[in-house]
């Protein structure tokens, strides 16, 4: 029977693995990290999920424990346990560096290793390559610089002020934590905020409705969904979820405009303010990082154009976990499971057309 290679052992890749196993389709999961869990192994220590634990579980395994909003480390541990429980063929420490087509098959390369498959699922998610502005290279060598993916806790920074560049959720969370030990300026456009506390009874009560809206209303099939997708992909980001503007103000975090220049080694904002800081944390998001794919289909933003996960013009190639891939929640735990079911459904139909016996 035709084999499927799944690239990435985060929640998207393991959700695909679950559906492939359920249908009796052979597959192998390749993970660049030395542990299952993908990017959840690389979050700051105090980071907490925005999604309640009750909505984080993958099929057949509710999220364990009594934490309402688990940490990134707890999410990674859950995913590792999930892969073991289902007996998935996951190969860690395999950094894929090439993908090309060879007739009706794909060749996936990782160093000296080559894997051949009829289907490839790119489940590397929306956070593959840190997006650090080019101007960061012009900052003084005396300024400690970290991207949010490398930030763990305040002990990594030196005494003195901190510019947190990027004012969406990661930037706001990190700025609030750093404010207890440093003078912090948070740079960037205010993205708005969710008015309710996510820990509140009201929010927990309405979360199932929110999840339904993310999955079934805000999709590429609906006008509201298409408008939301355009806004999200244009870099507007999502509203602040846990940290509120008043929290930042109460903690002494100062707001400033976007950083657009560097003068004499110091960051300068769009309105000309020079920030005399000793540290800079770049909470500036990520790039898709698909430059290792030698196939047509990448759009101008570096995303693979797809229809419900099936890459346009490349039969057998699929994506999972991309930002607003099909629905608002495609890049998080709420949306990857239904997206994975769509992708594996198409793989199963391809296998059936080739004469394979596939479980429904």
Language-model segments: what does each one mean?
Residues 62-67:
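A short acidic, helix-capping loop that chelates divalent metal ions and anchors anionic groups
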Residues 1-33, 37-39, 70-360:
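Flavin (primarily FAD) cofactor-binding/catalytic cores of flavoenzymes
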């Amino acid at each position: 029977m035709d084999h499927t290679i799944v690239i990435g052992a985060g929640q998207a890749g393991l959700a695909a693995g679950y559906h492939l196993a359920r249908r009796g389709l052979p597959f192998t999961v390749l993970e660049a990290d030395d542990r299952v869990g993908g990017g959840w192994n690389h979050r700051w220590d105090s980071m907490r999920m925005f999604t309640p634990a009750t909505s984080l579980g993958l099929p057949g395994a509710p999220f364990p424990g009594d934490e309402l909003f688990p940490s990134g480390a707890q999410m990674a541990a859950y995913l590792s346990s999930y892969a073991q429980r289902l007996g998935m063929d996951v190969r860690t420490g395999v950094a894929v560096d090439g993908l090309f087509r060879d007739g009706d098959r794909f060749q996936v390369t990782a160093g000296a290793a080559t894997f051949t498959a009829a289907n490839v699922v790119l489940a590397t998610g929306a956070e593959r390559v840190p997006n650090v502005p080019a101007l960061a290279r012009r900052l003084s060598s005396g300024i400690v610089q970290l991207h949010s993916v490398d930030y763990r806790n305040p002990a990594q920074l030196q005494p003195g002020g901190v510019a947190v560049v990027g004012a969406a959720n990661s930037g706001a969370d990190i700025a609030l934590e750093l404010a207890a030990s440093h003078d912090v300026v948070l740079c960037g456009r205010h993205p708005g905020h969710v008015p309710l506390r996510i820990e509140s009874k009201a929010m927990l009560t309405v979360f199932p409705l929110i999840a339904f809206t993310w999955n079934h209303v805000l999709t590429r099939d609906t006008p509201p969904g298409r408008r939301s997708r355009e806004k999200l992909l244009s870099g507007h980001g999502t509203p602040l979820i846990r940290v509120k503007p008043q929290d930042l103000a109460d903690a002494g975090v100062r707001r400033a405009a976007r950083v657009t220049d560097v003068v004499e080694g110091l960051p300068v904002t769009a309105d000309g303010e020079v920030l005399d800081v000793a540290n800079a944390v770049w909470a500036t998001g990520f790039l898709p990082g698909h430059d290792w794919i030698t196939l047509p289909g990448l759009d101008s933003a570096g995303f693979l154009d797809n229809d419900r996960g099936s890459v346009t013009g490349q039969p057998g190639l699929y994506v999972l976990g991309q930002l607003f891939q099909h629905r608002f929640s495609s890049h998080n735990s709420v949306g990857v499971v239904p997206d994975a079911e769509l992708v594996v459904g198409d793989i199963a139909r391809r296998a059936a057309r080739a004469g394979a016996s596939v479980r429904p």
